[in-house]
UniProtKB/Swiss-Prot annotation:
It holds the Pfam family EVE. SUPFAM superfamilies: PUA domain-like. Belongs to the UPF0310 family. HAMAP family: UPF0310 (MF_00771). It comes from Pyrococcus horikoshii (strain ATCC 700860 / DSM 12428 / JCM 9974 / NBRC 100139 / OT-3). This is UPF0310 protein PH1033. InterPro entries: EVE_domain (IPR002740), PUA-like_sf (IPR015947), UPF0310 (IPR022996). CDD domains: EVE-like.
Length: 145
């Protein structure tokens, strides 16, 4: 079993919950091809601003288990990044294990996969998902309310 942290925005987090599916754009299909049924996905909602310009802090919002092999589906359920046309067609079906919220920034010092604690956001830059050490997964699973 492999543990993954999956990077999304708040709007697509709602899609994930509603459809029980994780999707990535074409440029990340090779990463998704390594995902197998039984793997665990930790959903990370990135820092962003709301419509009023208020800063919304990054959070861990749930843990899911993968229930399918990767597949392709071009139906438009996800909102494209920055107004693009990408449909996040490379997908896996998932089921919820634990849903809740953890503020991410207080975890940074305890997460092993984040080597540069000052520039922690660079560990997510340009990625849709990345492997997560089991130790980090267990910490998140324990703290998720």
């Amino acid at each position: 079993m492999t543990y993954w942290i999956c990077i999304t925005n708040r709007e697509n987090w709602e899609v994930i919950k509603r459809h029980n599916v994780w999707g990535v754009p074409k440029k990340h299909k090779n990463t998704l091809s390594r995902v197998k049924p039984g793997d665990k996905l930790v959903i990370y909602v990135r820092q962003e601003k709301d419509k009023e310009g208020n800063l919304l802090e990054p959070k861990i919002v749930g843990i899911y288990e993968v229930t399918s092999e990767p597949y392709v589906d071009f139906s438009r359920i996800f909102k494209p990044h920055r107004g693009g046309k990408e449909t996040y067609p490379y997908r896996v079906k998932i089921k919820p294990i634990k849903i809740g919220e953890i503020n991410f920034k207080p975890l940074i010092n305890d997460l092993k996969f984040i080597k540069n604690k000052k520039r922690w956001s660079m560990h997510f830059f340009g990625k849709a998902m990345r492997e997560l050490p089991e130790e980090d997964y267990k910490l998140i699973e324990k703290l998720l309310l």
